[in-house]
Structures are given as structure tokens and as C-alpha cells.
């Protein structure tokens, strides 16, 4: 119960925080219990997170966090303004960490999630960015608090999605997967007009 209350539950809560520092703290707690939690507690913790054990601890955690991201994306599709009060970047970062640690990665599911995030945020990141406005346009450029929040949500999500995409590509390197990964990175680099997000998706 101590592990759940002070480590796992806290990580679960922080991973959806809108602030990058809070989500990062949640990720560090995930790394702690992923590596240090004794096997006898795995099933108990997975049930508390709404998941179930599927034999492998890392894959079970991936399944739980992938399900959570799917639910977050469903919510954002219904009302992006409401969903942007939290964040998905922490959940995506958790998936990238777990994918890197896993023996096998559910590539199709990860690819679908990456595409869903891109579909969600691309209208905001591909629009003309205020920081790129010409001097004479500055008076016409105004961002409401809601649009600022959505933009922040979007570029943070895109940063972590790029990292997840890279991990997935490296986990199963074939000529086709490398080409697909390159094509998607190129699409992002050619489409994104928001300076912060553009710098984040450039592959390492």
C-alpha cells in the first residue's frame, strides 16, 4: 500500500500534469517502481491502475499507459480546450521509456497512437506561428489564454511523440521501418511552423 500511495499513484497523477517539470517527476517515479518493484506486487499495482498482468511487467505497464493515452486522446477529440488543462506529454514519455526497456514493442499500436497525436495537434502547430509574424502583423496577432494553453499542450506532446517514434523505429530496424520513420519525421519538419515544436522533432 505504501508503494501504491507514495510512488505509483503519485507517478500516475503527475504524468498528466500540464507542467513539464511535474510530468518529468512522474516519469522518474515510474522508472523507480518499474525497476525496483518486487514481482509479487506487479498484479496488485496493475489492477489499481486499471490494467491487468499479461506475463511481462514492462509490457503490462505499456498496455496500461497506452490505454490511458487512448482515453486522453478520446477526451481531447471531444473538447481540446478542456483536455488541455492537463497534458499527454507525460504519458507519451512513459511509453517511450517503456518501449525502450521492453523486449518487444507493440509497433502497430504505438504507430496508431503517434498518428492520433499528430492528427490532434497538427492544426495548431502547422498554422502560422505568432513568433514568426512580420512586424506589421504583430498588432493583428493575439493569442487568448486558451490558445496559448493548447499550443503549449501541442508542442510538448509533439516533443515526446518524436522521441517515441524514434524508439519504435530503432526497436525494429528494417528497410521499410527506417523509410517509414524517415518519411514521418520529414512530414513533421516540412509541416510544423511553430518554432518550439519544430526544434523538438528533429531526430537525434
Tell where the protein language model's regions lie, with residue ranges.
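Amphipathic alpha-helical segments within extended alpha-helical solenoids and repeat-rich scaffolds
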Residues: 2-18, 47-77, 106-143, 176-193
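Long alpha-helical scaffold regions
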Residues: 3, 22-25, 38
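Alpha-solenoid HEAT/Armadillo repeat architecture
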Residues: 16, 81, 100, 170, ...
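Extended HEAT/HEAT-like alpha-solenoid repeat tracts in very large eukaryotic scaffold/adaptor proteins
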Residues: 22-30, 79-98, 113, 138-169, ...
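Alpha-solenoid helical repeat scaffolds
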Residues: 35-40, 101, 171
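Charged, low-complexity, helix-prone segments enriched in Lys/Glu/Asp/Gln
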Residues: 37, 65-69, 73, 84, ...
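Short, flexible/disordered intra-domain loops and linkers
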Residues: 42-46
Amino acid at each position: 500500500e505504501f508503494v501504491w500511495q507514495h510512488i505509483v499513484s503519485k507517478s500516475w497523477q503527475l504524468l498528466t500534469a500540464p507542467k513539464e517539470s511535474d510530468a518529468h517527476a512522474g516519469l522518474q517515479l515510474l522508472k523507480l517502481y518499474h525497476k525496483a518493484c518486487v514481482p509479487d506486487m506487479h498484479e496488485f499495482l496493475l489492477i489499481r491502475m486499471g490494467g491487468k498482468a499479461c506475463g511481462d511487467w514492462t509490457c503490462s505497464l505499456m498496455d496500461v499507459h497506452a490505454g490511458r493515452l487512448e482515453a486522453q486522446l478520446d477526451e481531447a477529440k471531444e473538447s481540446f480546450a478542456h483536455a488541455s488543462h492537463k497534458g499527454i506529454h507525460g504519458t507519451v514519455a512513459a511509453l517511450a521509456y517503456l518501449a525502450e526497456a521492453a523486449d518487444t514493442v507493440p509497433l502497430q499500436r504505438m504507430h496508431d497512437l503517434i498518428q492520433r497525436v499528430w492528427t490532434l495537434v497538427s492544426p495548431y502547430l502547422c498554422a502560422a506561428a505568432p513568433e514568426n509574424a512580420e512586424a506589421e502583423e504583430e498588432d493583428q496577432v493575439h493569442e487568448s489564454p486558451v490558445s496559448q494553453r493548447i499550443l503549449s499542450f501541442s508542442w510538448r506532446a509533439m516533443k515526446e511523440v518524436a522521441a517515441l517514434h524514434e524508439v519504435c523505429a530503432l526497436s525494429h530496424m528494417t528497410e521499410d521501418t527506417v523509410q517509414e520513420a524517415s518519411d514521418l519525421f520529414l512530414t513533421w519538419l516540412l509541416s510544423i511552423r511553430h518554432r518550439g515544436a519544430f526544434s523538438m522533432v528533429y531526430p537525434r
